[in-house]
């Protein structure tokens, strides 16, 4: 038996293999002893097949089958036979056949696992992460990783067919603390100095364009030391792309083609020839987010003019201070319980809103609301007309400065859609969000900061305002959004390729010439040697595969992810290191009590 090599995968056997002699290897998913007859569900990467072990065919090896348990690793030599009509298992791809064992070899025993190795288990995620090598045996997790492999292969094939060259960029690079915090790596041979792990290959891919490579791509690991969410990891993977002698339309057309190719090849899904486009201003106005989920409606409605001048002092005071009033219309939800409404007040408070007003439209068209008494019949009629409200609808209002209204009402829109089942989980709603503001004002730092990246090119017509009014400058910046998740962009497709414009942008964000030279001098110098117009995009591979696999967290599509506290429960990383290692690096640790 030990001389026999595996010649088939478990999940590939079918009626066409009837009477075929096969050698299978895998893990025991389940064992059932029917007294003189043992059934084994044998699992490998391809799926599960039923193995039948009886003394007449297996001889002395029947005793081995009696001793095996779940997750034992075994090899089986046997013959495929058709199942009888009444024993066909429609839940298995191989359910029409079984393998009658002639020989059985135990390759390894196994302890009882801490959870069942099967799909749909209700197990604490930390336990799954601690025993990740067992969690990854589960078919759904293996499907996720195989989908990820298929996606990356399709990406590479597409890029190669469009004349792109895959080039690796450094992992140990220079710290340029603009944006998220860097992961720092101490240099042993340069005492007191540090490398940084790259947050993106941004600078290097621009230098490759200066170097004349023209079309670059890379599937690259990036690192950011930031607070984690369901769709964030300290180390993540992206498809990085850069092109020379292009404009934004060239980049968007090429990457739409890439995404169509990936979805068709990996999922068999045909996507539209052209994706929708909307400006950043429009996205914020209608959806309260620069990552709008377009699988449902419930757009934000500007109610400022409709309520202005009424007797409701709260709204009037906010409007007088430059604030706005917006609402969403939750169709058919006027019967919402008061307890749930009170909970929504707490929900919007998370996003900075100081309150939430509501109006329930009764069957007779009248308005039920604590604030209805502050509005005349004429005002109420105009409010209902502006909101396109009908009997049975619920209006939810937030009044504050525009940024708070957008954040609170945009989040409430998503929350109400989830609660009311308005989101079609099978729908794929792509859009480009274009024309981002170049800068946003940081109240904390009392200066403008780049909304995404200081290397983004401003629109040509806005360049003169870099020195006079940076807040009015828009960027040649574009994000691809799918179902409310940014999957491509980083909002920096078109880069600055002129030294004078780059200097003006650094000046606008408060970087002195000396600071800019210290951080980016090598790149600024390169711009003086004939940098071509260039631009690109980065696709978040983890997020993209998460959506394609219909998962809720990118941890489900990464083989060995970190927890939300950036730790690896399986390897116990990060960990303490020996004092000797620290001395070699010329550093010491000082723990600061919080």
Regions flagged by a language model, labelled:
Residues 1-594:
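Class II aminoacyl-tRNA synthetase catalytic cores and aaRS-like
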């Amino acid at each position: 038996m030990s001389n026999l090599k595996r010649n088939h995968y478990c999940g590939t056997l079918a009626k066409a293999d009837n009477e075929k002699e096969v050698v299978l290897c895998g893990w025991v998913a389940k064992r059932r002893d029917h007294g003189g007859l043992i059934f084994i569900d044998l699992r490998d990467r391809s799926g599960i097949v039923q193995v039948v072990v009886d003394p007449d065919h297996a001889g002395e090896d029947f005793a081995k089958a009696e001793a095996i348990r779940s997750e034992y690793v075994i090899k089986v030599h046997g013959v495929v036979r058709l199942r009888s009509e009444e024993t066909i298992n429609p839940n298995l791809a191989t359910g029409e056949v079984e393998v009658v064992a002639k020989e059985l070899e135990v390759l390894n025993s196994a302890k009882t696992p801490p959870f069942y190795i099967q799909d749909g288990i209700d197990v604490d995620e930390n336990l799954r992460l601690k025993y990740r090598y067992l969690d990854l045996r589960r078919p759904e997790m293996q499907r996720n990783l195989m989908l990820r492999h298929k996606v990356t292969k399709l990406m590479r094939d597409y890029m190669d067919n469009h004349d792109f060259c895959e080039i690796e960029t450094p992992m140990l690079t220079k710290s340029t603390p603009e944006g998220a915090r860097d992961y720092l790596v101490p240099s042993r041979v340069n005492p007191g100095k540090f490398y940084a792990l790259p947050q993106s290959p941004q600078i290097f891919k621009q230098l490759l364009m200066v170097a004349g490579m023209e079309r670059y791509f890379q599937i690259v690991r990036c690192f950011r030391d930031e607070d984690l969410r369901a769709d964030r990891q300290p180390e993540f993977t992206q498809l990085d792309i850069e092109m020379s002698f292009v404009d934004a339309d060239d980049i968007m057309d090429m990457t739409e083609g890439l995404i169509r190719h990936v979805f068709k090849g990996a999922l068999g899904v045909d996507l539209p020839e052209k994706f929708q486009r909307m400006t950043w201003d429009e996205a914020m106005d209608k959806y309260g987010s620069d990552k709008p989920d377009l699988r449902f409606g419930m757009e934000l409605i500007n109610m400022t003019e409709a309520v202005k001048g009424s007797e409701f002092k709260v709204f009037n005071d906010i409007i007088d201070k430059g604030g706005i009033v917006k609402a969403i219309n939750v169709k058919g939800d006027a019967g919402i319980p008061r307890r749930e409404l009170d909970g929504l007040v707490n929900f919007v408070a998370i996003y900075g809103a100081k309150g939430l007003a509501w109006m329930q439209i009764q069957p007779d068209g009248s308005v039920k609301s604590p604030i209805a008494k502050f509005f005349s019949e004429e005002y109420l009629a105009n409010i209902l007309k502006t909101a396109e409200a009908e009997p049975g609808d619920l209006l939810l209002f937030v009044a504050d400065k525009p940024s708070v209204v957008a954040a609170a009402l945009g989040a409430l829109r998503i929350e109400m859609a989830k609660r009311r089942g308005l989101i079609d989980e099978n729908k794929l709603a792509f859009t480009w969000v274009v024309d981002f503001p170049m800068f946003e004002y940081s109240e904390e730092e009392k200066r403008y900061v780049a909304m995404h990246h200081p290397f983004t090119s401003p629109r040509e017509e806005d360049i003169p305002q870099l020195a006079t009014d940076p807040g009015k400058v828009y960027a040649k910046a574009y994000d691809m959004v799918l179902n409310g998740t940014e999957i491509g962009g980083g909002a920096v497709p078109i880069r600055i390729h002129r030294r004078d414009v780059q200097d003006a942008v650094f000046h606008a964000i408060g970087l002195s010439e000396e600071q800019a030279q210290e951080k980016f001098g090598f790149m600024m110098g390169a711009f003086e040697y004939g940098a071509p117009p260039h631009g690109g995009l980065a696709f978040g591979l983890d997020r993209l595969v998460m959506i394609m696999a219909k998962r809720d967290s990118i941890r489900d599509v990464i083989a060995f992810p970190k927890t939300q506290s950036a730790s690896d429960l399986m390897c116990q990383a990060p960990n303490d290191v020996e004092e000797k290692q620290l001395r070699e690096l010329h550093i010491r640790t000082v723990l600061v009590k919080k």
